[in-house]
Amino acid sequence: IGAPPHPDSPSQKGGTTKGPKSKDDALGTDPARERHIIAAVQDLVHNDKDVDLCKVSVPGTNLFCGDNKGIPRKEMPQLKSKPEPGGKADQMVKAGVLKLDNEGEVNTEKLFMKQIGKEAKPVRVKVTELKATQNQLVGKKVSLFLNQLQNGDPDSEFTKKLNEPIIVSRDPETGERYIVDGHHRWAALVAQDIANGGDGDIEMDIKEIDTPIEELIDQSNEFTKEMGLETKSGDKKK
């Protein structure tokens, strides 16, 4: 933040960054509203304000959080998180079974998949095909991520992390895809999709589990409790 854009970033390579100019370029039905939304999101990282993006609607779409499952952020599972002292995950770190990353977090996705006896299928989808499960999105966090996607070094570790696959539930009956973990990275890519206007659809890699979202949330919350993993709050102070 405050640094000049990287020369290889989309904003410096001629990419559209301010939203759609016409209905043909818009995600929904109101290009002017989309330009207003994206300007506000881009600005959040530079000021003292914050906005819950679940309270922001993109006309003609279910974005950002239309059809969400009404689950507060603090009640969502965190399969990548910090181990609580003395918990099972903490003990596995000390035993060398799990490794802490640079942020002091462990990735328990593989352990979770093994516990529920399911496979996570790698799929690449349009970001607009995914639905939010939680009912809170911290605007400042999405703004920070969007700033990196638009202005940061595409080959940096930060950008690579933002583009890592997220875990998604796919309902075997309806085909609906709901996000389990990775809401803020997804929302930043949605914002990028709005910002780039008619430059093409933004896609992301997902790990898809064929289980209805309610069942998968119950299973993953039980797992994170058992493992002793920190959950995250939607409180704007955090």
Regions inferred by a protein language model and the residue ranges of each:
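Short alpha-helix boundary/capping and kink motifs at helix termini
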Residues: T17-D24, T29-A32, I38-D48, C54-V56, ...
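Basic- and aromatic-enriched surface patches that contact anionic nucleotides/nucleic acids
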Residues: G2-S22, S169-K238
